[in-house]
Amino acid sequence: MKYILLIYNEEKAWANLTEAQGRQLMGEYMQFTKEIQENGNYNAGSQLQPTASATAVRVRDGKRLVTDGPFAETREQLGGYYLIDAKDLDEAISIASRIPSAKTGTIEVRPLVQTGAPATA
C-alpha cells in the first residue's frame, strides 16, 4: 500500500542551524533515503521551499483568489515528504519514525487512495 509521509517542522529551527549541523542533518536524510530505496519502500520524496515561496489558490463564487504564503499560520510548517510503499500502517509508522525530523517535528502518515478502491474514513 502507498503512504505519504508529510514532514512538519519549524522553519526557524532549520534556518538557525549552523553550517555543520545542516551538513549533519542532510547526511542523516541521505542515509535514511538510501536505506528506504534499498529496502524497496521508496517511491519519491523531496524537501520543499520555505513557506514564504508558497502560493495559495482558492476559487470562491467562480473567482480565483491567489495569495502569497501559507494559508494558515501554524507553529510547524510542511517542509517535505516521502511517498513510500509499506505492507501496512505499522510498517509505514516504523519507516516514518526513522525520518530525521521525527526527533524535532511531526511526521504525518496518510494512506493514499488505491486506484479503483473507495476511500475510507
Give a label for each model feature.
Residues 1-121:
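Conserved, structured core segments of small domains
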